[in-house]
C-alpha cells in the first residue's frame, strides 16, 4: 500500500500541474495513469469530460459509498518557493485540490488491497472553482449504474492544526453567486462632462449604494455578504467613460436571503439607470447551492472519529465559503468536513503551504469511516 512518502510524492506531482476548470487534461491523464496500475478485477473507471469516476469493487456489495475530490487550480501566480512549484505560469493549486485528489488516491489504494463488502465510488470532479462541475457531473449516466447511498468530501483548512477536523450538522457553507453589473452610458471629452454620461461616476455611486443592501435588508441574525472585487471602466485619463463593469460575489446563508439580496441589487441598478441616464444590466453567471450536511450522518461521523481517536474533532460554525459540493448534497445524503493543514497563509493565497502530514490523517479517517459504515 502507498506509504506517507509516496502519497506526498503524488501530491507534489499534482501540485506542479494546476489547470483551470474543464481544462484539467494533464491532471486527468495523471490520475488515469496512476489508477491503470491496479487490476481491472478491483477497479472500474469512467471518464466524464476532464473528470473521472472510479469504482472500487466490494466483496459482496449492497450499497455504494461515495467520495468527491475536486481537481482544478486557480489563476494565481505561485509564490511558495517550493522546489516543486507550479510549472504552469500564472496558475496554482492554491485551494488544496492537489491534496484532495491525493487523499482520494490513498483511500482507493487502501481498499484495492483490503476490500470491504460495499462498493466505493470516487468522483474526481473538475471545475469546482468555476464555472462549476458538480451540477453537470450529477447528470452523468454513470450515476445511474453506480448510485451513491451517501457521499462525502473534505476541504483543507489552513487555520486548523494537523490532526484536527472540523464540521457541523446542517448548514456548513453558504449559497454563493457571481455578480456582474454592466453600465453603458455616453462617452465624451473630459472637458465637456455635460455632454456625456460618465459611467465611472455611476459605478462609484452604485458601489456605495450596494453597501446598504446587507445592513438594511437582511435580518441582523442572518448573514450575507456582497463583495465587489473589480471595477473596470474608461480608456484614457481625458476621456469620459462610456462603459463600466462591476464584478463581485454574493454570499448568503439561505436561499431566501439570496433572492432578497438579488432583488435589492436589481432595484438599485434601476435607480442608477434613472439617475445617470444609462443602461444597467445585472447578471449572475454562476451560483453554488449551500452545503447542507446530513444531521444524522454528520453527528455519527463526528462521534466515531472522536471516540476512535482518529483526529481531534471540532464542531465549527458555518462559513461564507462557496462550494459546489452543495449540489451533490441536494441529490444524496452526506457531509463535508474541514481538514486542518496548519498553513500561515490562507486559501487562494499565493503562499499557501499546507502541512503534508494532513494527507495521512485524512486517509486514515476516511478508510476507518468507510470500514465502519460497511460493518467491518
From Swiss-Prot:
It is an enzyme of class 3 (hydrolase). The active site is at 70, 129 (proton acceptor). Its EC number is 3.5.1.47. Keywords: Amino-acid biosynthesis, Diaminopimelate biosynthesis, Hydrolase, Lysine biosynthesis. It catalyses: N-acetyl-(2S,6S)-2,6-diaminopimelate + H2O = (2S,6S)-2,6-diaminopimelate + acetate. Pfam families: M20_dimer, Peptidase_M20. One of its GO terms (molecular function) is N-acetyldiaminopimelate deacetylase activity. InterPro entries: AcetylDAP_deacetylase, Amidohydrolase, Bact_exopeptidase_dim_dom, Peptidase_M20, Peptidase_M20_dimer. Signal peptide: none annotated. GO terms for biological process: diaminopimelate biosynthetic process; lysine biosynthetic process via diaminopimelate. Pathway: Amino-acid biosynthesis; L-lysine biosynthesis via DAP pathway; LL-2,6-diaminopimelate from (S)-tetrahydrodipicolinate (acetylase route): step 3/3. NCBIfam families: amidohydrolases (TIGR01891). Belongs to the peptidase M20A family. N-acetyldiaminopimelate deacetylase subfamily. Catalyzes the conversion of N-acetyl-diaminopimelate to diaminopimelate and acetate. This is N-acetyldiaminopimelate deacetylase. It comes from Bacillus pumilus (strain SAFR-032).
Amino acid at each position: 500500500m502507498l506509504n506517507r512518502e509516496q502519497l506526498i510524492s503524488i501530491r507534489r506531482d499534482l501540485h506542479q500541474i494546476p489547470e483551470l476548470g474543464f481544462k484539467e487534461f494533464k491532471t486527468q491523464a495523471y490520475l488515469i495513469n496512476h489508477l491503470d496500475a491496479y487490476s481491472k478485477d478491483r477497479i472500474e473507471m469512467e471518464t466524464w469530460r476532464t473528470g473521472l469516476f472510479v469504482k472500487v469493487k466490494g466483496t459482496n456489495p449492497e450499497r455504494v459509498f461515495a467520495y468527491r475530490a475536486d481537481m482544478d487550480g486557480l489563476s494565481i501566480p505561485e509564490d511558495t518557493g517550493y522546489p516543486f512549484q507550479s510549472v504552469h505560469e500564472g496558475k496554482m493549486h492554491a485551494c488544496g485540490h492537489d491534496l484532495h485528489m491525493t487523499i482520494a488516491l490513498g483511500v482507493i489504494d487502501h481498499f484495492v488491497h483490503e476490500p470491504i463488502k460495499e462498493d466505493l465510488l470516487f468522483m474526481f470532479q473538475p471545475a469546482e472553482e468555476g464555472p462549476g462541475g458538480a451540477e453537470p457531473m450529477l447528470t452523468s449516466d454513470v450515476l445511474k449504474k453506480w448510485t451513491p447511498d451517501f457521499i462525502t468530501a473534505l476541504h483543507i483548512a489552513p487555520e486548523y492544526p494537523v490532526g484536527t477536523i472540523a464540521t457541523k450538522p446542517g448548514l456548513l457553507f453558504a449559497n454563493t453567486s457571481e455578480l456582474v453589473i454592466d453600465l453603458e452610458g455616453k462617452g465624451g471629452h473630459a472637458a465637456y462632462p455635460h455632454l456625456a454620461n460618465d459611467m465611472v461616476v455611476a459605478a462609484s455611486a452604485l458601489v456605495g449604494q450596494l453597501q446598504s443592501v446587507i445592513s438594511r435588508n437582511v435580518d441582523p441574525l442572518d448573514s450575507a455578504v456582497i463583495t465587489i472585487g473589480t471595477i473596470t471602466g474608461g480608456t484614457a485619463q481625458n476621456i469620459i467613460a462610456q462603459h463600466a463593469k462591476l464584478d463581485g460575489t454574493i454570499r448568503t446563508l439561505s436561499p431566501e436571503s439570496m433572492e432578497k439580496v438579488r432583488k435589492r441589487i436589481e432595484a438599485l441598478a434601476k435607480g442608477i439607470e434613472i439617475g445617470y441616464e444609462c443602461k444597467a444590466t445585472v447578471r449572475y453567471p454562476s451560483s453554488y447551492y449551500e452545503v447542507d450536511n446530513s444531521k444524522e450522518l454528520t453527528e455519527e461521523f463526528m462521534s466515531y472519529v472522536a471516540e476512535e481517536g482518529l483526529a481531534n474533532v471540532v464542531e465549527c460554525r458555518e462559513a461564507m465559503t462557496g462550494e459546489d459540493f452543495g449540489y451533490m448534497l441536494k441529490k444524496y445524503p452526506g457531509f463535508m468536513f474541514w481538514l486542518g493543514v496548519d498553513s500561515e497563509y490562507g486559501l487562494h493565497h499565493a503562499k499557501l503551504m499546507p502541512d503534508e502530514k494532513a494527507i495521512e490523517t485524512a486517509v486514515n479517517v476516511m478508510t476507518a469511516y468507510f470500514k465502519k459504515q460497511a460493518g467491518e
